[in-house]
Amino acid sequence: MAEGKAGGAAGLFAKQMQKKFSRAQEKVLQKLGKTVETKDERFEQSASNFYQQQAEGHKLYKDLKNFLSAVKVMHESSKRVSETLQEVYSSDWDGHEDLKAIVGNNDLLWEDYEEKLADQALRTMENYVSQFSEIKERIAKRGRKLVDYDSARHHLEAVQNAKKKDDAKMAKAEEDFSKAQIVFEDLNQELLEELPILYNSRIGCYVTVFQNISNLRDVFYREMSKLNHNLYEVMSKLEKQHSNKVFVVKGLSSSSRRSLVISPPVQSCAASSPVSPVSPVSPVTSPTSPSATSEPESVSATGEELTSEAGGEDSCESQESLKDEEADEAQSETSSSLPACNGPTPAPASPAAEVGSQEEALSSSAQSPGRGQTGKDTPSPGDVVLRARASSEGAEQSKRAASIQRTSAPPSRPPPPRASGSGSCNAPGSPEGSSQLCSPRASPDASSNPEPAETREKEGAGSSGPEEPRAVSTKSATQASGGLVGLFL
């Protein structure tokens, strides 16, 4: 009996060694290109998906195990903190019995969460991962049967192509090939049917696991929130019982470090109710008092700015009258003979005139108020010539020119060009431009000086420069006044 068993075991071992040798030989021939390897693209794709699914499943299972371990650690830490709090809480303090119930419920809640997490999440993932090993073994077996099938096929082809035919060897080769083909095709077909089903089952597994985790978290956090509110109420009762006790951190005998008073915690109503309670804050100074007192100051400041602007313009006009003595008389008389700044037909301003007006505005803002008044300025020679020519044109034209000066144009019209020697005019957008009109310098001087026109013309002739510029200025003033009469007739 013992000899028979030993012989059978030896025969089985020899048979296995022969298979391993035959498979190794076939693989070497396939790598060298001596034989053709059978391939199935459909199975290879399914096998690739399986290996990817296996790697993802093992990674998720490992992370869930770490998550459960962390929950256990948190459970133990929370339990120790609760037990220590119960030990230090004196029995004569308010809420001693309530604290004992809170600590017990806290421990039970952690235990329930830990057990259900292990049962509904970790065990489900464990069952899902456990089937990978079986499928992996079947895929490896299918690979071995594929090598046997290729080896039997190549052996049959070699026997059939031999020069010397042997019917016994041919029959034996055909029988071995048929067996290897049946075994391989059956196993291959089973895997082709099972692998896609297993690959699609991963979706249902993930849904089940994470639905269970989310539900367990929801229940756990909701119940834990209730326990936290109960604990906060117990501590609030203790605070009311000993309201005269203040938590102070002393400086530990350090001269540079002061004692600190710990602020009270945040109210618990912020978590339970949508509107958080209003905590007492330090009174804030109302902003209405400074604004009420600042209104008169702003009004007075605005008035001072307007006064300084008017004084600056007057002083600018006196400075310009001094500069006119050296400027060109033709340009000064032409610009002075124009109507008011807001006249109906202003000429387009040239770039040079605009630059000059900007420079005059800058100089007027820089001048200090009160340096000179317009009504008291001494008229320049150009102004005297202008007054003489204006009086000789007739009373009717002077009345129409005065009426034109009194009219105000809409604020959208630009100001007329001004030469460097003419009087200053208020801009349309300035506060003074809407209420006051720009007038030639001759109007205040003509009203205050009662001398006749002939005497003033002689004085102007005596103080003016050469005769040629005076003739040109007289001609230009006459043309300008005639054009104004033609426009209003």
Curated annotation (Swiss-Prot):
Localization (cell): Cytoplasm; Cell projection, Podosome membrane; Cytoplasm, Cell cortex; Cell projection, Phagocytic cup
Entry keyword Heme: no
Sequence ranges assigned to domain BAR in this UniProt record: 28-244
Start and end residues of each stretch annotated as Disordered: 267-489
Keyword Lipid biosynthesis: no
Subunit structure: Homodimer. Interacts with BIN1. Interacts with ARHGEF6 (via SH3 domain), ARHGEF7 (via SH3 domain), SH3GL1, SH3GL2 and SH3GL3. Identified in a complex with ARHGEF6 and GIT2.
Protein name, per record: Bridging integrator 2
Lineage, uppermost ranks: Eukaryota, Metazoa, Chordata, Craniata, Vertebrata
